[in-house]
Amino acid sequence: MKNDLFLRVLRGEKVERTPVWIMRQAGRYLAEYRKLRAKVPHFLDVCRNPELACELALQPLQRFPLDAAILFSDILTIPDAMGLGLSFVAGEGPQFAKPLRSSAAIESLTLPPSGSLDYVFAAVSATKRALNDRVPLIGFAGSPWTLAAYMIEGGASKDFAFAKSFAFSQPQAMDVLLTQLTCAITDYLRGQIKAGAQAVMIFDSWGGVLPYWAYEQFSLPYLKKIVAAVHTVAPVIVFTKGGGLWLAAQKTIGAAALGVDWTVSLAAARKIVGESIVLQGNLDPTFLMTDPKTIRQAVAKTLADYGNGHRYIFNLGHGITPNASPDNVAAMIEAVHELSPQYHQ
């Protein structure tokens, strides 16, 4: 492989500089992405077309010297395959036609039918071929709690109050759903790895809305089961948005790396998780709306916060926003390339 910095860090090897990639690096901030999406306005039509998904995954690599590519898809492909009727409404985000609003609905749910997610695996294979060993390819899935939250809530939410109240009042039914999703996600990630993904990431996007005890009940144990089943075939990154206070618990998941958002000090996180776990993050995406000088200063602070060592991957603390400037993205990557080698002596 021409550039294996990302994988070398996950394996615990020494590297000459800090690798960098961006969550949602294929997205609306790129004019070429908007141009393609104008031709194919329905988001799921793009995800279900391996050639288009491959093209979008490669777009940021054609523009920026990133150290990894990530599959172009969505975390809600699994519940869609389970028959909940996923659609994306402009300005409102994802919606399910058949949300799970009772224990009976959960009991009647079945795993995704065989072949229903083959389009995702085909997109992985197509992207891997097109990369031609330029950089590693990351596969991904949502966490059991995050998928369950969407499936019960029926769509996007600021606080997922309905999903939380269901979990609190019907924990046994919630366990049935989370256990089923754990099986589906495990198979899904292993399928992506078989198709060519060299690392996988689990997005626990809404773990941070839970109280600490509820995180330990409704998210943590299921993440552990998935990682235990997957980490032997590829390194796993786990990212719980808003979960920085729970790093002591997260270090028990068994993941090769933990993502952190911008509310967390990398130095403090490093002390908590120890030297055997990679940290990934955590620049506030808002910096990409500023200017190159400000961004360079922020990158310098972020790198210094982690300090010397080889167990760190530079990223944002959440997905890149549509109003980010591509020129500022280039400035951020350049700053990482120029400023990080001093920490790898």
Curated annotation (Swiss-Prot):
The lineage of its organism: Bacteria, Pseudomonadati, Pseudomonadota, Gammaproteobacteria, Cardiobacteriales. GO terms for molecular function: uroporphyrinogen decarboxylase activity. Substrate binds at residues 24-28, 74, 150, 205, 318. SUPFAM superfamilies: UROD/MetE-like. It comes from the Bacteria. Catalyzes the decarboxylation of four acetate groups of uroporphyrinogen-III to yield coproporphyrinogen-III. NCBIfam families: hemE. It catalyses: uroporphyrinogen III + 4 H(+) = coproporphyrinogen III + 4 CO2. It comes from Dichelobacter nodosus (strain VCS1703A). One of its GO terms (biological process) is protoporphyrinogen IX biosynthetic process from glutamate. The keyword Cytoplasm applies. Pathway: Porphyrin-containing compound metabolism; protoporphyrin-IX biosynthesis; coproporphyrinogen-III from 5-aminolevulinate: step 4/4. One of its GO terms (cellular component) is cytosol. InterPro entries: UROD/MetE-like_sf (IPR038071), Uroporphyrinogen_deCO2ase_HemE (IPR006361), Uroporphyrinogen_deCOase (IPR000257). Belongs to the uroporphyrinogen decarboxylase family. Homodimer. Keywords: Cytoplasm, Decarboxylase, Lyase, Porphyrin biosynthesis. The keyword Cytoplasm applies. Its EC number is 4.1.1.37. It is found in: Cytoplasm. This is Uroporphyrinogen decarboxylase.
